[in-house]
Amino acid sequence: MAKQHGKHPDTALAQNRKARHDYAVEETYEAGIALTGTEIKSVRDRRVNLKDGFVQVRNGEAWMQNVHISPFKEGNRYNVDPLRSRKLLLHKKEISKLGAATMTKGVTIIPLKMYLKHGFAKVLIGVAHGKREYDKRQDIKKREQQRQIDRVMKHY
């Protein structure tokens, strides 16, 4: 058995901070991404924007759309379109679950976080449905109440 070294946390390269505010995430999946050489260099430089991204299931494959990976500075002719569709690497069972989930009205799949794991770029995707304004207000109210409880408990 191989010797285990200390566990390193996944290095988050990009996060979709608005996602948990605008959507209620029900389930998450970890997916690999098929990237070109210059794209992975840009990802390592943290030049990624997940804000407008979403995932589509087409012909038994999962594709990530609208995720902006900036062109690599020294990439010249090897750079590709920053907003191109990128294939996600998932098991067939996971893809079929995602496909079934998107058939439900109001459910979407969004990228939550991009990180490196053992040298490979991974994306944490979430099956989510959009929050309404009153849902957001309830979340803010709960957070404020928790802060007040923490403040009071800090003194005792």
Swiss-Prot record:
GO terms for cellular component: cytosol. It holds the Pfam family SmpB. One of its GO terms (biological process) is trans-translation. The keyword Kinase does not apply. It comes from the Bacteria. It is found in: Cytoplasm. Signal peptide: none annotated. GO terms for molecular function: RNA binding. Keywords: Cytoplasm, RNA-binding. The keyword RNA-binding applies. SUPFAM superfamilies: Small protein B (SmpB). InterPro entries: SmpB, SsrA-bd_prot, SsrA-bd_prot_CS. Required for rescue of stalled ribosomes mediated by trans-translation. Binds to transfer-messenger RNA (tmRNA), required for stable association of tmRNA with ribosomes. tmRNA and SmpB together mimic tRNA shape, replacing the anticodon stem-loop with SmpB. tmRNA is encoded by the ssrA gene; the 2 termini fold to resemble tRNA(Ala) and it encodes a 'tag peptide', a short internal open reading frame. During trans-translation Ala-aminoacylated tmRNA acts like a tRNA, entering the A-site of stalled ribosomes, displacing the stalled mRNA. HAMAP family: SmpB. PANTHER family: SSRA-BINDING PROTEIN (PTHR30308:SF2), TMRNA-BINDING COMPONENT OF TRANS-TRANSLATION TAGGING COMPLEX (PTHR30308). Belongs to the SmpB family. This is SsrA-binding protein. It comes from Lactiplantibacillus plantarum (strain ATCC BAA-793 / NCIMB 8826 / WCFS1) (Lactobacillus plantarum).
